[in-house]
């Protein structure tokens, strides 16, 4: 849906396996819209990171 279309990631790390396993390691006040496994640290502002893994990276947030 739209969540996946609007999801973006600036720092995506992938393994060298085939297919690759990729994870977005951006840290922000919230996780991207398509994130299922979001972990936030209680700080001000909160620091959230998505722990989903995919075979691809989302497009960059800041072109």
Curated annotation (Swiss-Prot):
Lineage, uppermost ranks: Eukaryota, Viridiplantae, Streptophyta, Embryophyta, Tracheophyta
GO molecular function, one term: serine-type endopeptidase inhibitor activity
Top-rank taxon, per record: Eukaryota
InterPro entries hit by this protein: Bowman-Birk_prot_inh, Prot_inh_BBI
Annotated site location: Reactive bond for chymotrypsin: 42-43
PROSITE patterns in the record: BOWMAN_BIRK
Disulfide bonds: 8-61, 9-24, 12-57, 14-22, 31-38, 35-50, 40-48
Record's GO cellular component terms: extracellular region
Organism of provenance: Vicia faba (Broad bean)
Protein's name in the database: Bowman-Birk type proteinase inhibitor
Pfam families in the record: Bowman-Birk_leg (PF00228)
Site feature location: Reactive bond for trypsin: 16-17
Keyword Disulfide bond applies: yes
Keywords: Disulfide bond, Protease inhibitor, Serine protease inhibitor
């Amino acid at each position: 849906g739209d969540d996946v279309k609007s999801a973006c990631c600036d720092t995506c790390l992938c393994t060298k396996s085939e297919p690759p396993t990729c994870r977005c390691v951006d840290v922000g006040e919230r996780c991207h819209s398509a994130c299922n496994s979001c972990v936030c640290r209680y700080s001000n502002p909160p620091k959230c990171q998505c722990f989903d893994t995919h075979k691809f990276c989302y497009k960059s947030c800041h072109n």
